[in-house]
Amino acid sequence: MLRHNFRSSIFIRIVANSWSITRSVSSAPIKAESRKQQDSLKNIDSGEAYTALGNIRQKKDVFHYTDRASGTGYSHYSNSVYQHRPYIWPPLRKMYNWNYAFVIAGMVILMSDFEWIKEQIKGASTPFRPEASQKEESTDSGTEIEVKEKPKKKKLGFRERRIIEYEDRLRLYSTPDKIFRYFATLKIIDPNDESGRIFEVFMTPEDFLRSFTPGVMQPRRWGLDSFKAYNPEKHKRHKFSDPNSIFYKLGENGLINFSDYLFLMTLLSTSHADFALAFKIFDVDGNGALDKEEFTKVQQLIMSQTTVGQRHRDHVTPNSSFRVETNSALETYFFGKDGKGSLSSEKFIEFQERLQHDILKMEFERRDAMENSDGLITEESFAQLLLLHAQIAEKKQKHMLKRVKRRFKGDQSKGVSFDETKAFFEFLYHIDDVDIALHFHKMAGMSIDAKLLKRVAVKVTGIPLSDHVVDVVITLFDDNLDGKLSHEEMVAVMRRRMRRGLERPRDTGLFRLFDAVLECGKRAYHASPLPFY
């Protein structure tokens, strides 16, 4: 009994001691944490000691950045939050820095001029080509072989295409003074002006042709109000046109000022019959000739009827170089330096025909010449010359030219001379009479083939056409390849070609729409019997 009591007392003492030890050990951290919180709250305002949910606000370290625990990567850490985040293969993550290399390489490729690099490589590899060894062998043997290589056309880049599109819109919709300021390249400074700010702007014949020819880009050095200073006394030998050309007779070395530019554009867009009628109207004396004053009235009348003259804004032109002058080179050529001469209608129409001839010659010389032949252009180039101002969709135009190229290739290609081109364009000057004749033949049930077209040309205009040129024209406008000519489209295209696109309205059509709506409203107002309130 005593032994049992002794054992129980020892057990009770052991349990009590362990409880006291456990209690002291477990309560020590709690007391330390509570003392720490009390010390931290001494310097905190009572309003900021607790959060919105009633919890004690913990003091943050000044350099605390994130609560994220350190791990193997962002994808591993976020998988517990975003369950559907794609898995990235660890070796692929190590290649992340290669992205910078790919971006830099792409930028270098986009900024590289591959045409220049290609030319450099081609120039460096020329001595190592087989052609070079053949040339060396031919020179060693003493034989002189002249090989004319056809220069390849340089493909237009993105920048050039955008510039050409802008310049084509400029030709269509801008005022004549802006077109002149953009395409003119020369200026002659007034010798009496020491500052050099007073000058007159001139066009060369090439500038004049470029100002209304679509698809031809202005040289990069020149643009709007950008001109090269030209001194006629220092450059007396420099001629910008052939002495036999009509441009050479207009002024200094064949240069064109703004007044002459306006009237030359009017000449290109007006037929011979209109000028002959205007001469008869203003010939008060009835002697068949006009003096300077009467010619000025004819000039103003014709210009007011053309789109070029209607768009001219003489009253708002800032520079005197772009105003119509009463004493221009044209008037000096027609009436002499004193202005007392007279101009007959025959002389004026002859001047107009020579102008058409010189411009056609410059357009012909711009075409692609045939290989190993002088003075001939390819049939495709002749077709391009006919479609120059056709206003046909680009896709259809390419299809028409492709048809001509397939028809005249290899031995079938004979080339077209300037005399043949000139004869066909003289035939086109009577396009209205040709249209009537072809229409009558069609009403009679006759198909328009090459034989009929040549006969109409001789009977109506008195101009014989070569068989080869007629074959090219029929191939160009023969859509169904039956050897017959669809003359309606040909006549419409040739009319626009002879006017060189100068008869088109010089606006986008929006203002004409507003004018039409206003005119219809006025007519409805005056014609309505009901009062408008």
Curated annotation (Swiss-Prot):
Subcellular location: Mitochondrion intermembrane space; Mitochondrion inner membrane
GO cellular component: mitochondrial intermembrane space; uniplex complex
InterPro entries for this protein: EF-hand-dom_pair, EF_Hand_1_Ca_BS, EF_hand_dom, MICU1/2/3
CDD domains associated with the record: EFh_MICU
Domain EF-hand: 270-305, 337-358, 465-500
Transit peptide residue numbers: 1-13
GO-annotated molecular function: calcium ion binding
Residue segments, region Disordered: 127-147
Biological process per Gene Ontology, one example term: calcium import into the mitochondrion
Keyword entries, A-Z: Calcium, Calcium transport, Ion transport, Membrane, Metal-binding, Mitochondrion, Mitochondrion inner membrane, Repeat, Transit peptide, Transport
Binding site for Ca(2+): 283, 285, 287, 294
Family, per entry: Belongs to the MICU1 family. MICU1 subfamily.
Function noted in UniProt: Calcium sensor of the mitochondrial calcium uniporter (mcu-1) channel, which senses calcium level via its EF-hand domains. At low calcium levels, micu-1 occludes the pore of the mcu-1 channel, preventing mitochondrial calcium uptake. At higher calcium levels, calcium-binding to micu-1 induces a conformational change that weakens mcu-1-micu-1 interactions and moves micu-1 away from the pore, allowing calcium permeation through the mcu-1 channel. Also required to protect against manganese toxicity by preventing manganese uptake by mcu-1.
Record remark on domains: The EF-hand domains have high affinity for calcium and act as sensors of calcium levels.
Protein name per the record: Calcium uptake protein 1 homolog, mitochondrial
Organism: Caenorhabditis briggsae
Gene name, Swiss-Prot/TrEMBL: micu-1
